[in-house]
Amino acid sequence: KYMEMWKAAGIKVAPVVSGAALARRLEQAGADLLIAEGCESGGHIGELTTMALVPQVVDAVQLPGVAAGGIADSRQLLAAFALGAVGAQLGTCLLVSEECPIHANYKEAVLKARDNSTTVTGRIAGAPVRILKNAMTRDYLKLEKSGAELLELEKFTLGGLRRAVFDGDVQRGSLMAGQVAGLLKEIKPLRQIFEELMAGLPAVAQGLTDKKII
Protein backbone atom coordinates (compact mmCIF):
# COMPACT_ATOMS: atom_id res chain seq x y z
CA LYS A 1 0.00 0.00 0.00
CA TYR A 2 2.89 2.37 0.67
CA MET A 3 4.41 1.78 -2.75
CA GLU A 4 1.21 2.90 -4.48
CA MET A 5 1.01 6.00 -2.29
CA TRP A 6 4.62 6.97 -2.93
CA LYS A 7 4.37 6.42 -6.67
CA ALA A 8 1.14 8.42 -6.85
CA ALA A 9 2.98 11.30 -5.17
CA GLY A 10 5.73 11.15 -7.80
CA ILE A 11 8.33 9.77 -5.38
CA LYS A 12 11.16 7.61 -6.72
CA VAL A 13 11.35 4.43 -4.64
CA ALA A 14 14.68 2.65 -4.05
CA PRO A 15 14.22 -0.23 -1.59
CA VAL A 16 17.12 -2.05 0.07
CA VAL A 17 17.17 -5.78 -0.71
CA SER A 18 19.13 -8.68 0.74
CA GLY A 19 18.21 -11.33 -1.84
CA ALA A 20 17.05 -11.95 -5.40
CA ALA A 21 13.54 -13.10 -4.46
CA LEU A 22 12.81 -9.87 -2.61
CA ALA A 23 14.27 -7.92 -5.53
CA ARG A 24 11.82 -9.56 -7.93
CA ARG A 25 8.85 -8.84 -5.66
CA LEU A 26 9.78 -5.20 -5.32
CA GLU A 27 10.29 -4.86 -9.06
CA GLN A 28 6.76 -6.17 -9.58
CA ALA A 29 5.50 -3.76 -6.92
CA GLY A 30 6.85 -0.79 -8.88
CA ALA A 31 10.25 0.08 -7.41
CA ASP A 32 12.40 2.41 -9.52
CA LEU A 33 15.79 0.94 -8.57
CA LEU A 34 17.13 -1.50 -6.01
CA ILE A 35 19.90 -1.23 -3.45
CA ALA A 36 21.58 -4.61 -2.99
CA GLU A 37 23.11 -4.44 0.48
CA GLY A 38 25.61 -7.09 1.55
CA CYS A 39 26.20 -8.25 5.09
CA GLU A 40 29.46 -6.27 5.32
CA SER A 41 27.26 -3.23 5.97
CA GLY A 42 26.72 -1.60 9.32
CA GLY A 43 23.25 -1.74 10.84
CA HIS A 44 20.55 -4.25 9.91
CA ILE A 45 21.85 -6.82 7.44
CA GLY A 46 21.01 -9.98 5.54
CA GLU A 47 23.23 -13.03 5.13
CA LEU A 48 24.77 -12.63 1.65
CA THR A 49 27.98 -10.72 1.02
CA THR A 50 28.02 -7.86 -1.47
CA MET A 51 30.20 -9.90 -3.83
CA ALA A 52 27.62 -12.70 -3.93
CA LEU A 53 24.48 -10.57 -3.71
CA VAL A 54 24.91 -7.82 -6.31
CA PRO A 55 25.31 -9.97 -9.45
CA GLN A 56 22.40 -12.19 -8.41
CA VAL A 57 20.14 -9.19 -7.90
CA VAL A 58 21.07 -7.45 -11.16
CA ASP A 59 20.59 -10.73 -13.04
CA ALA A 60 17.18 -11.27 -11.44
CA VAL A 61 15.56 -7.95 -12.39
CA GLN A 62 15.47 -5.36 -15.15
CA LEU A 63 15.83 -2.43 -12.75
CA PRO A 64 19.14 -0.64 -12.14
CA GLY A 65 20.98 -1.99 -9.12
CA VAL A 66 23.05 -0.06 -6.58
CA ALA A 67 25.66 -1.88 -4.49
CA ALA A 68 25.97 -1.32 -0.74
CA GLY A 69 28.15 -2.86 1.93
CA GLY A 70 31.93 -2.89 2.05
CA ILE A 71 32.50 0.18 -0.14
CA ALA A 72 34.83 2.89 1.11
CA ASP A 73 37.52 3.42 -1.54
CA SER A 74 38.05 3.43 -5.31
CA ARG A 75 38.97 -0.26 -5.46
CA GLN A 76 35.70 -1.29 -3.91
CA LEU A 77 33.70 1.18 -5.98
CA LEU A 78 35.14 -0.18 -9.23
CA ALA A 79 34.43 -3.71 -8.03
CA ALA A 80 30.78 -2.72 -7.51
CA PHE A 81 30.59 -1.58 -11.13
CA ALA A 82 32.22 -4.83 -12.26
CA LEU A 83 29.52 -6.77 -10.40
CA GLY A 84 26.86 -5.01 -12.46
CA ALA A 85 25.85 -2.13 -10.21
CA VAL A 86 25.21 1.30 -11.70
CA GLY A 87 26.24 3.04 -8.50
CA ALA A 88 27.05 2.59 -4.83
CA GLN A 89 25.46 3.49 -1.52
CA LEU A 90 27.99 4.53 1.11
CA GLY A 91 27.45 4.41 4.84
CA THR A 92 30.31 3.77 7.21
CA CYS A 93 32.82 6.02 5.44
CA LEU A 94 30.33 8.89 5.71
CA LEU A 95 30.03 8.46 9.47
CA VAL A 96 33.50 9.98 9.73
CA SER A 97 32.76 12.93 7.48
CA GLU A 98 32.96 16.42 8.99
CA GLU A 99 29.30 16.98 8.19
CA CYS A 100 27.94 13.84 9.87
CA PRO A 101 26.13 15.00 13.06
CA ILE A 102 26.95 11.99 15.25
CA HIS A 103 28.88 12.35 18.51
CA ALA A 104 32.66 12.80 18.22
CA ASN A 105 33.19 9.69 20.37
CA TYR A 106 31.28 7.61 17.81
CA LYS A 107 33.49 8.90 15.00
CA GLU A 108 36.63 8.19 17.02
CA ALA A 109 35.47 4.63 17.67
CA VAL A 110 35.02 4.07 13.93
CA LEU A 111 38.49 5.46 13.20
CA LYS A 112 40.05 3.17 15.82
CA ALA A 113 38.35 0.08 14.39
CA ARG A 114 40.35 -2.77 12.86
CA ASP A 115 39.29 -5.43 10.37
CA ASN A 116 37.80 -7.59 13.14
CA SER A 117 36.22 -4.84 15.25
CA THR A 118 32.59 -5.47 14.29
CA THR A 119 30.22 -8.19 15.39
CA VAL A 120 26.64 -9.17 14.59
CA THR A 121 23.95 -9.18 17.26
CA GLY A 122 20.33 -10.19 16.93
CA ARG A 123 20.67 -13.26 14.72
CA ILE A 124 18.76 -15.45 17.16
CA ALA A 125 16.07 -12.77 17.45
CA GLY A 126 15.76 -12.68 13.65
CA ALA A 127 17.02 -9.10 13.29
CA PRO A 128 20.81 -9.21 12.73
CA VAL A 129 22.67 -5.93 13.22
CA ARG A 130 26.37 -5.27 12.54
CA ILE A 131 27.93 -2.97 15.13
CA LEU A 132 31.30 -2.23 16.70
CA LYS A 133 32.26 -4.55 19.55
CA ASN A 134 31.95 -3.05 23.02
CA ALA A 135 30.72 -3.90 26.52
CA MET A 136 27.10 -3.84 25.36
CA THR A 137 27.67 -6.33 22.52
CA ARG A 138 29.54 -8.72 24.82
CA ASP A 139 26.71 -8.67 27.35
CA TYR A 140 24.06 -8.95 24.63
CA LEU A 141 25.67 -11.97 22.98
CA LYS A 142 25.93 -13.71 26.36
CA LEU A 143 22.25 -12.98 26.97
CA GLU A 144 21.36 -14.19 23.49
CA LYS A 145 23.25 -17.47 23.94
CA SER A 146 21.62 -18.04 27.33
CA GLY A 147 18.26 -18.43 25.62
CA ALA A 148 16.73 -15.11 26.68
CA GLU A 149 13.30 -14.36 25.27
CA LEU A 150 12.84 -11.85 22.45
CA LEU A 151 11.20 -9.24 24.69
CA GLU A 152 14.14 -9.34 27.10
CA LEU A 153 16.60 -8.91 24.22
CA GLU A 154 14.63 -5.98 22.83
CA LYS A 155 14.57 -4.27 26.22
CA PHE A 156 18.33 -4.76 26.55
CA THR A 157 19.06 -2.84 23.33
CA LEU A 158 16.38 -0.17 23.78
CA GLY A 159 17.92 3.28 23.35
CA GLY A 160 21.28 1.89 22.25
CA LEU A 161 21.52 3.88 19.03
CA ARG A 162 20.55 7.10 20.82
CA ARG A 163 23.27 6.50 23.40
CA ALA A 164 25.82 6.13 20.60
CA VAL A 165 24.72 8.95 18.31
CA PHE A 166 23.77 11.65 20.81
CA ASP A 167 25.47 10.72 24.09
CA GLY A 168 28.71 9.33 22.66
CA ASP A 169 28.56 6.28 24.92
CA VAL A 170 31.00 3.95 23.17
CA GLN A 171 30.60 1.14 25.73
CA ARG A 172 26.82 0.87 26.13
CA GLY A 173 25.74 2.44 22.84
CA SER A 174 24.90 0.67 19.58
CA LEU A 175 27.74 1.83 17.31
CA MET A 176 26.49 0.67 13.92
CA ALA A 177 29.36 0.40 11.44
CA GLY A 178 30.42 -1.84 8.58
CA GLN A 179 33.48 -4.01 8.11
CA VAL A 180 35.22 -1.30 6.06
CA ALA A 181 35.69 0.70 9.27
CA GLY A 182 39.23 -0.68 9.45
CA LEU A 183 40.09 1.23 6.26
CA LEU A 184 39.09 4.61 7.66
CA LYS A 185 41.86 6.68 9.22
CA GLU A 186 40.73 10.32 9.34
CA ILE A 187 37.77 12.67 9.36
CA LYS A 188 37.28 14.40 6.01
CA PRO A 189 34.77 16.77 4.38
CA LEU A 190 32.11 14.98 2.33
CA ARG A 191 33.32 16.68 -0.82
CA GLN A 192 36.83 15.27 -0.33
CA ILE A 193 35.50 11.76 0.32
CA PHE A 194 33.56 11.71 -2.95
CA GLU A 195 36.28 13.43 -4.96
CA GLU A 196 38.88 10.89 -3.81
CA LEU A 197 36.56 7.98 -4.61
CA MET A 198 36.05 9.18 -8.16
CA ALA A 199 39.60 10.41 -8.75
CA GLY A 200 41.04 7.02 -7.85
CA LEU A 201 38.98 5.04 -10.35
CA PRO A 202 41.22 5.51 -13.43
CA ALA A 203 44.33 4.29 -11.61
CA VAL A 204 42.50 1.25 -10.25
CA ALA A 205 41.14 0.43 -13.70
CA GLN A 206 44.58 0.86 -15.27
CA GLY A 207 46.06 -1.40 -12.62
CA LEU A 208 43.66 -4.13 -13.69
CA THR A 209 44.61 -3.64 -17.33
CA ASP A 210 48.31 -3.92 -16.49
CA LYS A 211 47.90 -6.88 -14.16
CA LYS A 212 49.02 -10.27 -15.41
CA ILE A 213 46.42 -12.94 -14.74
CA ILE A 214 48.15 -16.14 -13.62
Each language-model region and where it sits:
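Alpha/beta enzyme core
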Residues: 1-66, 73-92, 171
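Conserved active-site-proximal phosphate/metal-binding subdomains
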Residues: 52-66, 72-214
